[in-house]
């Protein structure tokens, strides 16, 4: 038998209300602090994400710049010449090699008919551009500038050449320094001049960060277009004492380039431009010989006319002159 006291205890336990868990109410300051901390965490996370994105973009840009610079700093210009080059043009080539630090010299070419083989030589020597001094008959020098192997190629006839040793100018520049390139306004007037300007810029401009180059500019390569010819000059940038302006002092060398033809490929291909005002040195020599021959013919003709006039003007002696001879 269950005691009634135990039954009453069970009934009381069932009827008693269950005590609810006590929840501590947070104060307004604690709520504000929690909200502020959450906002700060969100801001920090956003800033960290933005920084990560910026770092990734910078790394991408650095990699792209490294690729571009690696391609640009590997730019090389191959210098070569044909057999029979004279001392004057050989010294000119040596001067240009000393002024262009990203240049590379190659042996002479035996056969002029196989100029397209220079493209293979450039590929073997890992050169992007080529300059050829093609001397014919010991006096005529043709300068070929080419972007190998796809082109274009520009052929010039060089005249009025003066080397550094010949000029002995007061200007001077450090070997390996980078040059400024200055072009006349007339280079933007015609299409073929714009092409020549771009090719000269790519060949003569020293790439930034090149191994053999110095990280500053102290001379200027100037190209002027006048009388259908390109005039080349090299000046030193020297600062005058007690003056803000800079002074240009000529260094040398000097040369005048007459445009002959522009080809589509490297040392060959179709002719993109042919200068109608260009006269080859062979034609000038033949004209000079013809003028000399014409002078000789005129002199002989005048001599024959003089003899005829003398015969006509000759007066035979009269009988009066011989009266007193007996």
From Swiss-Prot:
GO biological process, one term: rRNA processing
Keywords: Nucleus, Ribosome biogenesis
Stretches for region Disordered: 1-66
One example GO MF annotation: RNA binding
Domain Brix: 75-268
GO cellular component: nucleolus
Pfam families noted in UniProt: Brix
Family of the protein in this entry: Belongs to the BRX1 family.
Name under which the protein is recorded: Ribosome biogenesis protein BRX1 homolog
Natural source organism: Dictyostelium discoideum
